[in-house]
């Protein structure tokens, strides 16, 4: 039986995720959007690349949630970007309405699926998706940490002048300014990153990582990143469908780990067929724990805003 992946939202991130997934031959792909013609056109275009790129998966575009039934993985990328003059609360409300609508329609049709959220504000939207779906918390997660860690690894490799393949890096916390990169748990082929990069330069790399999404928005002027976010999402889908037991940072539901309760928050996990199969608790020092708590406070504030709407 072939695996089935449904992607809700056929914008740049959604359609590029479909591209990465097709190239990896992870399963048949359903690309869904509310705008007629967009998912159908993008899906057909991608499907027509299959004889050239030699991937043997079916790709369909649709506006009908019935086509997503019995999915193994549901990826939600749909959401509104923040517009000029829009308050943080306005953005939360708009995207909460979108998330509620998507999940309430998709989840009942695929009761055994793993849900991966890719819309913002991520931790709050993932919490909402878990609530609306009623799924076990380990089968609902958010993608941010894999992307943030990839940016962190890229900048470390650039600075050290080494292959990015040899850079391992860990970070935690919320997405964006609230993220907590962990240099103490970052290595180049097992060698501490501090052996290659001076503390002041590493501090600059950490700051650039925190602002990574904004840097691309400022360069593009009219959009945001999509290649790397889509690749990060595809890596998570692959870990689930192939039961790879990957150790990656994702937004997972916490029940006391790191002293945090009843919230989705970026932590290292073991990711496999069951979704978040284990949450890894790192022995953080006082400084790292202070940064983590500050991040958690910001994420909690967003969650409180969501709950008050």
Swiss-Prot record:
Substrate binds at residues 82, 88, 120, 151. CDD domains: LDH-like_MDH. Its EC number is 1.1.1.37. NAD(+) binds at residues 9-14, 33, 95, 118-120. Keywords: NAD, Oxidoreductase, Tricarboxylic acid cycle. The active site is at 175 (proton acceptor). One of its GO terms (biological process) is lactate metabolic process. It is an enzyme of class 1 (oxidoreductase). The keyword Zinc-finger does not apply. It comes from the Bacteria. GO terms for molecular function: L-lactate dehydrogenase activity; L-malate dehydrogenase (NAD+) activity. InterPro entries: L-lactate/malate_DH, Lactate/malate_DH_C, Lactate/malate_DH_N, Lactate_DH/Glyco_Ohase_4_C, Malate_DH_type3, NAD(P)-bd_dom_sf. It catalyses: (S)-malate + NAD(+) = oxaloacetate + NADH + H(+). Belongs to the LDH/MDH superfamily. MDH type 3 family. NCBIfam families: MalateDH_bact, PRK06223.1. Catalyzes the reversible oxidation of malate to oxaloacetate. This is Malate dehydrogenase. It comes from Chloroflexus aggregans (strain MD-66 / DSM 9485).
């Amino acid at each position: 039986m072939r695996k089935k992946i449904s992607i809700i939202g056929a914008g740049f991130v959604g359609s590029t995720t479909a591209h990465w997934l097709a190239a990896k031959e992870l399963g048949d792909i359903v690309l869904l959007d509310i705008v007629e013609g967009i998912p159908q056109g993008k899906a057909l275009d991608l499907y027509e690349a299959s004889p050239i790129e030699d991937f043997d998966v079916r790709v369909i575009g649709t506006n009908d949630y019935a086509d997503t039934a019995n999915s193994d993985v549901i990826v939600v990328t749909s959401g509104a970007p923040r517009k000029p003059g829009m308050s943080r609360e306005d953005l939360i409300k708009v995207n909460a309405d979108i998330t509620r609508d998507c999940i309430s329609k998709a989840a009942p049709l695929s009761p055994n699926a793993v849900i991966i959220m890719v819309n913002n504000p991520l931790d709050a939207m993932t919490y909402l998706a878990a609530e609306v779906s009623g799924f076990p918390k380990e089968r609902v997660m958010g993608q941010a940490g894999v992307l943030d860690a990839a940016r962190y690894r890229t900048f470390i490799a650039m600075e050290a002048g080494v292959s990015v393949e040899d850079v391992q890096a860990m970070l935690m916390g919320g997405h964006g300014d609230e993220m907590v990169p962990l240099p103490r748990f970052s290595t180049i082929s097992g060698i501490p990153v501090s052996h290659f990069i001076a503390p002041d330069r590493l501090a600059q790399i950490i700051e650039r990582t925190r602002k990574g999404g904004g840097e691309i928005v400022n360069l593009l002027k009219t959009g945001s990143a999509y290649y790397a976010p889509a690749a990060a999402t595809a890596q998570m889908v692959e870990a689930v469908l192939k039961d790879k037991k990957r150790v990656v940072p994702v937004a997972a539901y916490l029940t006391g780990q790191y002293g945090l309760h009843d919230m989705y928050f970026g932590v290292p996990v073991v990711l496999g067929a069951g979704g978040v199969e284990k949450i890894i608790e790192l022995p953080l020092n006082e400084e790292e724990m202070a940064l983590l708590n500050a991040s958690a406070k910001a994420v909690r504030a967003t969650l409180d805003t969501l709950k008050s709407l």
